[in-house]
Design a protein with these regions (language model features):
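Conserved aromatic anchor
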Residues: 273-285
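Short beta-strand segments within Ig-like beta-sandwich modules, predominantly Fibronectin type-III
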Residues: 302-308
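Extracellular fibronectin type III
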Residues: 331-336
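Surface-exposed, short loops/turns at beta-strand junctions within beta-sandwich domains
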Residues: 314-322
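Flexible, surface-exposed loop/linker segments and immediately adjacent secondary-structure boundaries
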Residues: 37, 71-265, 270-273
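Extracellular LysM carbohydrate-binding repeats and other cell-envelope/extracellular binding modules
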Residues: 22-27, 50-87
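Primarily a LysM-type cell-wall glycan-binding module
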Residues: 21-49
Length: 336
């Protein structure tokens, strides 16, 4: 390493203490960088940092008192807000809607491959579904009647995955966050009632202004969740969920309910009979949701409706295969 490199950071042995002192649902304030042979501060600043360099921020983040030499392999804490940034983007991965969907200032309706950038607001009409693919492979799925703003979608010079902040203003959103993202790269989703910080996971978020309630349901990984008026986030793990009340308070964590199982089918009378499928009732279910499509992954044309009883009406059978997904919904609104 070039011996002219001054220590303008502290070795990252303090990173764990520093990071844990913040609410993990908040934005991580530093990025870790490992010093390489030939690095000098001037080279690092020119390549990675916004100019002019905010020396006060560097000194504050690293608790510097003296300039010293920094060995190769040491990890540096660089304040996130001084790192160079560039725009990232998402693209429409799948789309199912009988009517055109437009975003503000767009000359054309959404289509497969349409590029979505920071600031876009996507409002999904009833009976429609939209999926977005981020540059790092993360997927955002918007079901019927959802409204989502892409508040932040940008990359910085030190991390490969984009920083993501989403605001859900209506309905539900399903997220499959790429597991290869760095733990310090922000991926956050907010509703008027809750804030979720993500570290590589699959989960769902719901919000209804009519019911004045929200939900967080984790299918894999860990989601740091807090209500908008809570002071501390709680980790929600796979198979668990938490309802959020109208005051922005996260309520008791619940086990997500299992789906109802297929029990039997009874044919109706007629030359082309329909069927009534009997489902095994789930004791704590308030109602059930059935999604159906012509593809096994439920992309393309997709319909969704609620079942108040554990019975599913299946129209006459055709040569076209239909796939069904059944879920149970608890009294607090958590979807299993």
């Amino acid at each position: 390493m070039n011996k002219s490199l001054p220590l303008l950071f502290i070795a990252a042995m303090s990173l764990g203490v520093f990071a844990q002192s913040k609410d993990s649902a908040d934005e991580p304030s530093v990025i870790s960088y490992k010093i390489k042979t030939g690095d000098t501060f001037s080279k690092l600043a020119q390549k990675y940092l916004q100019q002019p360099v905010d020396m006060a921020a560097i000194q504050k983040a690293n608790q510097l008192k003296n300039i010293d030499m920094l060995p190769v392999g040491a990890e540096l804490l660089i304040p996130r807000h001084i790192v160079k940034q560039s725009a990232s983007h998402a693209s429409i991965m799948s789309l199912s809607c009988a009517t055109p969907i437009r975003i503000a200032d767009a000359s054309k309706p959404l289509a497969i491959g349409t590029v979505i950038r920071e600031g876009a607001i996507i409002e999904v009409p009833p009976e429609c579904h939209v999926s977005l693919l981020l540059e790092d492979g993360s997927v955002i799925r918007l079901p019927s009647s959802a409204a989502l703003k892409i508040t932040t979608l940008r990359k910085n010079a030190l991390e490969s995955a984009p920083e993501v902040r989403l605001d859900l203003t209506r309905g539900r959103v399903e997220l499959d966050v790429h597991k290869g993202r760095a733990k310090t790269t922000p991926f956050e989703i907010r509703t008027p009632l809750s804030i979720m910080g993500v570290r590589g996971t699959e989960f769902r978020v719901g919000y209804s202004s009519e019911d004045n309630a929200g939900q967080v349901e984790v299918l894999g990984g860990i989601v740091q969740t807090r209500g908008s008026t809570d002071t501390k986030a709680r980790p929600i793990t796979k198979g668990l969920g938490v309802p959020i009340d109208g005051d922005g308070k996260a309520l008791a964590i619940e086990q997500l309910l299992p789906p109802p199982a297929f029990e039997s089918a009874i044919a109706t009378a007629g030359s082309q009979p329909s069927f009534v499928a009997k489902l095994t009732p789930i004791p704590l279910a308030n109602y059930y949701v059935v999604d159906s499509a012509n593809t096994a992954n439920l992309t393309g044309n997709r319909s969704s409706h609620n079942l108040l009883a554990p019975e599913l009406f299946i129209p006459r059978v055709t040569k076209q295969a239909t796939f069904y997904q059944l879920t149970s919904v608890s009294a607090s609104g958590l979807v299993g």
